[in-house]
Regions:
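Nucleic-acid endonuclease domains
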Residues: 1-103, 116, 122-203
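Active-site beta-strand-loop-beta-strand hairpin of nuclease catalytic cores
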Residues: 108-117
Length: 203
């Protein structure tokens, strides 16, 4: 027999399930997502303004730290804008925006006495609400949990409108992710070591 009842029962319990981001951070980091505090509005607006200032300063200036060449891939521009956002936070508030590494959340800062976890996205059409995946989380390794060391805090998502690599148009949307619902899906994955450990029929 190549299956076990325990694994069968486990797999049958998996599948699509609607969860909240709050569930995710509580389950894996044992922390709470706090509702956005509107007292942060003025400083957040300054941060957004600074993002555009840095982008304009860097545009067409290859010597600038945040220059983004027009021939670079657009799907890497989102990570670049996130770096600009981190710099903008430091410029405006003097607070370090720390990169936490791969996996959600990947940036932490502190504004107005609150821990803030900003997520940054770009889009050529920020008014379009599509069904393509634009946000995801994954089960963190124990080492990742220790490195990220999450605290209770606010989780917000910046979505900037772009007109090609290196060009932000000045339009944006900012979302409070507290209570955000999304779908948890079971995923099984293997590699060639798993396959090659099987009985080979030809070859």
């Amino acid at each position: 027999m190549s299956w076990t009842q325990e694994n069968v029962d486990f797999l049958r319990g998996l599948g699509k399930r609607s969860i909240t981001l709050n569930d995710y951070v509580k389950a894996y980091y044992d922390v709470e997502i706090l509702p956005y505090d509107i007292s942060l509005n003025p400083i957040l607006q300054k941060v957004i303004d600074r993002v555009y200032e840095i982008t304009k300063e860097a545009f067409d200036n290859p010597q600038h730290e945040y220059y983004y060449a027009p021939n670079r891939r657009i799907n890497e521009y989102g990570n670049h804008v996130e770096d600009v956002l981190c710099q903008a936070i430091e410029d405006v508030d003097g607070t370090e925006a720390k990169n936490l590494g791969v996996g959600y959340p990947d940036v932490r800062t502190k504004l107005g006495g609150y821990f803030l976890y900003p997520e940054c996205k770009i889009s050529s059409n920020i008014d379009e609400v599509g069904s393509m995946r634009s946000f995801y989380t994954s089960v963190p390794a124990e080492r990742t949990k220790k490195i990220k060391n999450l605290q209770d805090g606010m989780h917000i998502l910046f979505k900037f409108h772009h007109n090609g690599p290196g060009v932000l148009t000045g339009r944006h949307k900012v979302f409070d992710l507290n209570g955000m619902q999304y779908v948890s899906e079971a995923l099984q994955q293997g590699n060639d070591k798993n396959v090659y450990a099987c009985k080979m029929l030809f070859g």
